[in-house]
Amino acid sequence: MSSERRKDNPLRFALILHLLAVLVQGDIQPRFSCYNHYLAGIRTSSVLPISGHSSAPSNVKCIFENDVAFTEIHSALENSYQVMGKKSVNFQVLDLFHLRELVRRSHCTQTLTVTWKNVPEAGKGGLKVVSLLNETTRIEYSGDERQDFLFDETFAGVRHLIPDEDDNESNPTVTTTRLLCKHIPQPECLVRGKFEVDLEANLEWSYAFSFKTDITNQTLFTLRCGDTTSEVRLENDFFIRADGNAPVAVTHLSDATWHTAIVKHNQPDSHFLKIDDFPEIELGKSISDDTDKTITLSISVNGNIQLIDPTDTNDDCMYSFDKPQKRLQETVSTRTMCVGCGCPKLSGTFDGLSKCDEEDENSYNLRRDVDRLSFIHIDNAFDIDSNGAAIPAISTSFKSDSDVGLIFFGYWQNFHGKGRLQVYYHYDTISAVFCKHTDDEECSSCSIRSSEGFGKDQWIQTILWGGGDEIHLAVDSSVCRLQQLSNISLAEVYAIPQISGGAGLFIGGTWHEKKRRGLYKADAEQKYFENTREKAPVLRGCIKDVFVRGSKTDVSEMFEVQKQAMLNEPDDSNAFAVRKYCQSCIPACSEGTRCRSRAPLQDSAMICDCADELQFNTSEGTCNRERDTPVALSTAFLSENQIVLDIQNTKAILSKVWLKFALPKQINQAQRIVEFNSHRETLFNINLETDGTVNVQLHGQDTASRQLNLLDDRVHLLQLQRRTPMGTRHSAKKYDLYIDGFHTVVSDIGKLVLNNVSVTAAETEDEWSSVIVHDLGLSYEYDEHFAISHPSNVIHQVDLHSQLLPYQIRAPDLSKTGILDDSLWEKPAYVTDSEAAPVLESSPHGEVVDFTADIIEPEQLLSGRWILYSLFLTILLCLFILMCIVCYWCVLRPRAMRRTDTGSQRTIIRDSPDYAPVKMRRDSIGGISIDDDGSIGTDDTDLQAYRDIPSHRVKIYRESMVSILVPSIDQPAEAAIVKRSHSTISDQTPSRPHDTSHAPLVAVNDD
């Protein structure tokens, strides 16, 4: 038996390593905008990388509120600047083509403040402001010292500043706010139904789309080539299954929020799928490249599809008959998706499991108490498989203000074997361990990490379910599979109760230490007590929505059963440190601030811990931060070069130190900024080297450092934050060091009591050469184990910055003290285990540079939108030319032909022997007589006006051989009509026949 297990281990271990790579959150990929990150499943506002299709990424702050994505972009004008000449302004996003496209696709706003410190001569002055999209605004002096302008849409994003006069001291000083762009989704790119795209089978390609659904167990997409088909399905909310292979845990995919899928083909006979920022999943090799056929990607989701591939968005997602490689079959659906509380999850295992963040009247509050136990115990909590191992199907939602705590501890013993499981969290990691004991103990585990940690006083749902080798841990939307690994540590896992039988589950704590005598039954203590040090401590906080064996459990009923089984006096409501209902703060705390007990005692008041937002508690229980008053650490600004600030003694524990500072432009010699001391020795100090390296020195040789850019005008943040140790091991006491987005772990700085803080002023001349301190503070939290009743053992903060202000002899110029940009201090959205992963912090704001004329954006000339515009203009131009041609041939040319005969034609008519002038009369021509010369009428003198033939226009009617001489405007309104025979012209004019003339008669008005 054991030999077979050993033979199977290498193969199983290889498979585990492959699956493990799938379960770890990957690095965040750069995307076009914050909206694209939102479509990739990111819901927490944070600093994220964005880039164009061929540009280097820039890190900007992304804000997600109520399903709306905002992109926050800073510029060099956030620091005040006097405009002394034509200047151009750079932004966090270096690629201006990408930045302009972002502004075009979004609704952006920016505020410009113009300050006239000196009145212009003659009361006149002004400047032109040109936006990123080349919109110009003229600003003139109006008599007010300060003018504010709100720019939006195409006017947002100040790019150029052009003053009326260069090098004029009266020119204004300008500042701008951040450029905030609200993304506007394209309705043309939203698909409800089925979408197909044809791709080349033997070429490298990738295609991206986003999807949103609340239904699991459905087909996500299929790849079809000839007679072969590969199908990818969503299963059991968290899993992807390709072609019937083993399901792969990814994330909660049926949560009615957007996720992004990228299908790739970049290796022979291999196709890959990438979901959000998780590692790629290799699909089955059912489709071969040995063909010249086309691969059809067919996307069909019972929900919504968002087209985000560049081949779609560049054409505004418009398709017609000329693009047969993409086909859309939309369906009309009025169904509303289920979002949030009440939406079922893992319905194949649990009955009515859902994630609800609302307060619940059935919630229970657990406290850490030196005299009393704190947990919920449930008997018969697991089903048992044929091998004697538990099949867990347990879940609860918890919230805690502590960064360490026990969530579940389960155990089972039967004829076939025994085992234990434990789910607990410490700082930024939740871990699950599952051990089954037959001959030897075999354990599997996995962990889920969060950059925000899990002690943030917010509801977190934890689920453990499965059996055999398929046991999974889910924390909110994250999931991992427990696997057998060689480096699993069981030091923090509680032991199986030795004499307990059956299967039981502890929630929120366990019987890990002796408590006050007389409260608990001796047989219960003997049954469950483990006589070892404390490991994962009690979950200090609240629990609700407890599921055991897949069904929701009435915690009140279970707690009553627990008291009957374990208490000497079952009616003693204070025997356990457990209370119904979850305590809250009044008024409610702001977002990002924890509601906590002020002291370790059970009845202590609840307050907001303002240090979470680097603020200070007031006597009214609210949070406050004094107005930003920078202090320059220079002898030119401070009355002393060494300032010692005393700290009052306290029984509380130093939990956080923070320092906001701006660097000088140039450092001539190394400088000690601040030193933290006890009465005996220096605890730690913060130093600045000449190259901009900030060095934190702890206990002599233990140091941590990071080099900063001296040209960066932004205010930096240094934080030291205490990690609560697991159990009672002092060697586990650590502090987290943050310098902006950089993070490392250092040794304990609180071994001795902090008594004073020493601040050093350097011998510098001005603000540019000095360290500028914007804030300096300390935070304390109560000690849970010692001096519990001492009045100083409470949560409080110390404002050291305010204690520095009395030593300031003159205030620095605020325009030279740095830019406050809290996005520089943001923690990353995800925690990665890769040491090579770059620090993800916001990019520099850029600089104000000499005027640089913007060039034409060449890629726009090739975009689908510009092609459509060009085609439309071309069609209009062709129609206009066609109309001109038709007008010329049908109207203008016939008129010109009637009016333009040559003089030679007129001469031929006049000199012809057939020429015989006639006089047209006003009256009726009924009684016409014919003269001897064959003309109508006999008075030749009436025709003298027509002898000058060239002064008349002539038209010859060839059918009747009649010429009409039309007089010009300066001749009498009479005409001569000549009829010619078809015979050859001779010198002798034939006699006129006496019958009626065939020439037409024209009545002419002589007037």
UniProtKB/Swiss-Prot annotation:
InterPro entries (alphabetical): ConA-like_dom_sf
Impact noted for substituting E513K: In cy4; 66% of animals display defective axon branch formation and guidance in VC motorneurons
Organs and tissues of expression: Expressed in head and tail neurons, the ventral nerve cord, the VulF vulval cell and in the somatic gonad. Expressed in the male-specific sensory neuron HOA.
Coiled-coil ranges per UniProt: none
GO cellular component: axon; plasma membrane
Entry keyword annotation includes Cell membrane: yes
Glycosylation sites noted in the Swiss-Prot or TrEMBL record: N134, N168, N217, N487, N617, N756
Record topological domains on the Extracellular side: 27-865
Membrane topology: Single-pass type I membrane protein
Superkingdom as given in the UniProt entry: Eukaryota
Compartment(s) of residence: Cell membrane; Cell projection, Axon
Entry's transmembrane regions: 866-886
GO BP term (any one): nervous system development
Subunit structure: Interacts with casy-1; the interaction establishes synaptic connections between neurons.
Function as written in the Swiss-Prot or TrEMBL entry: Maintains the normal guidance and termination of axonal branches of VC motorneurons. By associating with cell adhesion protein casy-1, mediates axonal interactions to establish synaptic connections between the male-specific sensory neuron HOA and the AVG interneuron. Plays a role in regulating male mating behavior.
Entry protein name: Neurexin-related protein bam-2
Species annotation: Caenorhabditis elegans
